[in-house]
Amino acid sequence: MTLIVTGAAGFIGSNLVKALNERGEQRIIAVDNLTRADKFKNLVDCEIDDYLDKTEFVERFRRGDFGKVRAIFHEGACSDTMETDGRYMMDNNFRYSREVLDVCLAQNIQFLYASSAATYGGSSRFVEEREVEQPLNVYGYSKFLFDQVIRRVLPTAKSQIAGFRYFNVYGPRETHKARMASVAFHNFNQFRAEGKVKLFGEYNGYAAGEQTRDFVSVEDVVKVNLFFFDNPDKSGIFNLGSGRAQPFNDIASTVVNTLRSLNNEPALSLAEQVQRGLIEYISFPDALRGKYQCFTQADQSKLRAAGYDAPFLSVQEGVDRYVRWLFGQV
């Protein structure tokens, strides 16, 4: 049977295509928008059955042009949290997703989709409950609104619907995201270009570089998606983060030490890195004051209750792997 991946040339989508290939799956229809043509590089080492532009996909999907479809991994979206064109964002992330969902429900196709931790916005709790969801931008709202649709249809759906609230994902195949790429990606490039990594200084009671995020490797994101793909009886909206908040200092320090290791230099403590000027703290920008999350951490209770029991990579493990991959691409 056929599998469909939307956003297939993007960060998470291309990692899913590659992982499906490694399982022997090649009857994959890749759907994307290659207006930004450089994304094609993410699919060069992947095997797909066909490629479709997103503008023609839904109508052909509705008509049944692809025969028997087992599942769709719906990763296609505008993920730029700085996008201010609300009409574009809602058409791309909400309306388009509803159309894909409607076809899946009508044809009993597994529907696994990308939600986002941006649905929580200014909340201090990160549990999949309506009362703690406070999106701060139109991107978060587009994901939040679609999740509300899912909550309404879940009780009567006859096929799987699984949504994943991605936290701060990092890993291979994100180069095309440019300024929206992960902190690890930018730290890697900054250190290679300038010989140091710059982090925000003290803010809102957090010491320099100690603001925290739930950083999750794309390796783990793919594993969770495939777990639900293999278990079509499990539905719901699930946080997809490591469940562990770690400071930006951990990212920067791991990037520095991994690059030092690749240069046959010994690892240094964070204090030594700061003392040597390898990590530098800059004043917290006035433009971000009052708009910046100093802490995120996925509550994994619902994910674990669904039966996913594999451990998640720590920043030290995942970023080390990622930096070595990036270094190999240079």
UniProtKB/Swiss-Prot annotation:
Alphabetically ordered keywords of this record: Carbohydrate metabolism, Isomerase, NADP
Sample GO molecular function, one term: NADP binding
Domain notes: Contains a large N-terminal NADP-binding domain, and a smaller C-terminal substrate-binding domain.
Lineage: Bacteria, Pseudomonadati, Pseudomonadota, Betaproteobacteria, Burkholderiales
Organism: Paraburkholderia xenovorans (strain LB400)
Role noted for this protein: Catalyzes the interconversion between ADP-D-glycero-beta-D-manno-heptose and ADP-L-glycero-beta-D-manno-heptose via an epimerization at carbon 6 of the heptose.
Residues that span the membrane, as ranges: none
PANTHER family: ADP-L-GLYCERO-D-MANNO-HEPTOSE-6-EPIMERASE, NUCLEOSIDE-DIPHOSPHATE-SUGAR EPIMERASE
Protein's name according to its UniProt entry: ADP-L-glycero-D-manno-heptose-6-epimerase
Substrates-to-products reaction catalysed: ADP-D-glycero-beta-D-manno-heptose = ADP-L-glycero-beta-D-manno-heptose
Record pathway: Nucleotide-sugar biosynthesis; ADP-L-glycero-beta-D-manno-heptose biosynthesis; ADP-L-glycero-beta-D-manno-heptose from D-glycero-beta-D-manno-heptose 7-phosphate: step 4/4
Binding residues for substrate: 168, 179, 186, 200-203, 213, 292
Entry note: cofactor: Binds 1 NADP(+) per subunit.
